[in-house]
A protein has these predicted regions:
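Short acidic/glycine-rich loops and adjacent helix/strand connectors
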Residues: 1-318, 323, 329, 342-345
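Short linear/disordered segments characteristic of secreted peptide precursors
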Residues: 329-333, 337-339
């Protein structure tokens, strides 16, 4: 569509893939979507209930799109696929599967990599509940080892500073990374003291007294701005040295957390190679430091590490995943015989 972050149905992309493969829709064994909408809706409801009555306006704004479309995504996808293929409304379609968000990230990273064994780290804003996860890939098996849940999120922390420095959330994070070299990391201690507690294994907890994103329309609150002594920068304003230093500070904190998570992942897996996925994996400065200072001999980053790359899991998902779920709803094992090699693209 040539529209950045286009949220519409990817008809052109589907047409292209089918054309390149020389097949039509009826020849597909499955269509896989990279999210579980009902789990995500569960997270939204639990979060709004936990913060009520705060966030009521945000709740009212969010619900229409869920009640009209997102909760019925399977029906929407079937309708769009039939229209795309020019099929009768009752014509059969390939089976429709839904993976968990971080499951999609991990599969897209490991199964597209050149490795037969690797640690896999997924870092982003949030999927259904998970915000950070560690996996171990071996041959055709991909096993989750650890994960961190919303609202504690490295991606959302970085997005909060993206917003504070005048850039658009979920779009301008690369600009914040580019701004960082022009500043000095003077506020690293402030961030660690007030905003985030980080453990040696890389797990962390955000001080939610400073953030509004769980139920608000903004990422941060007035307490966050007061911490740095200035309001959020407007989009058209020239950043002063304060904002340059803040950008440098959150970039350094992000790099240090990524390094700790990587060291823990290496301890858990014993692997010498690492695959990365999730939006945070697009932070090339952190990736460079991870390659130089991290515990892994080789690093492979999913080229479309953000949500756009979730579709890469599809070719491996149907044959390679058997999900066992414990009482807490977390996937604890994903392993099954599979004839798709781990390096398949």
């Amino acid at each position: 569509s040539r529209l950045k972050h286009d949220a519409g149905f990817p008809a052109d992309a589907i047409h292209y893939c089918l054309r390149e493969a020389g097949i039509d829709l009826s020849e597909l064994s499955a269509v896989v979507f990279y999210d579980k909408p009902l789990l995500k809706f569960e997270r939204l409801l639990e979060t709004y209930l936990a913060h009520a009555p705060r966030g009521f306006r945000s709740f009212l704004m969010a619900m229409p799109v869920w009640l009209k479309e997102k909760l019925y995504l399977k029906t929407v996808l079937r309708r769009e696929l039939r229209a795309l293929a020019g099929l009768d409304p009752k014509a059969p379609l390939p089976k429709l599967l839904f993976s968990q968000h971080h499951q999609a990230h991990a599969a897209s990273a490991f199964y597209a990599s050149p490795y037969q064994e690797a640690a896999v780290i997924c870092l982003d804003g949030v999927g259904e509940w998970a915000t950070s996860s560690i996996w171990h890939g071996q041959g055709n098996q991909l096993r989750p080892l650890a994960e961190l849940h919303f609202p504690h999120s490295l991606g959302l922390l970085y997005s909060a500073f993206t917003y504070y420095c005048g850039f658009k959330v979920n779009s301008g994070e690369y600009k914040l990374m580019g701004l960082a070299p022009y500043g000095e990391p003077k506020y690293v201690d402030v961030i660690y003291r007030e905003l985030i507690t980080v453990r040696e294994d890389g797990s962390f907890a955000l001080n939610m007294r400073y953030f509004a994103y769980p139920v608000g329309s903004r990422m941060i609150n007035q307490r966050f701005a007061a911490l740095f002594g200035a309001p959020p920068l407007t989009a058209d304003a020239e950043p002063s040295q304060l904002y340059l230093d803040i950008a440098a500070s959150i970039q350094q904190v992000t790099e240090e957390i990524v390094l700790k998570i990587a060291r823990y992942a290496q301890q858990l897996t014993g692997a010498s190679k690492l695959c990365l996925a999730g939006g945070v994996a697009l932070n090339c400065v952190a990736n460079g430091r991870l390659l130089r200072e991290g515990p892994f001999q080789e690093l492979w980053i999913q080229p479309a590490a953000g949500d756009a790359g979730g579709a890469l899991l599809a070719q491996a998902f149907d044959k390679c995943f058997v999900t066992v779920v414990n009482n807490g709803g977390m996937p604890i094992e994903h392993q099954a015989p599979c004839n798709i090699p781990a390096h398949a693209a």
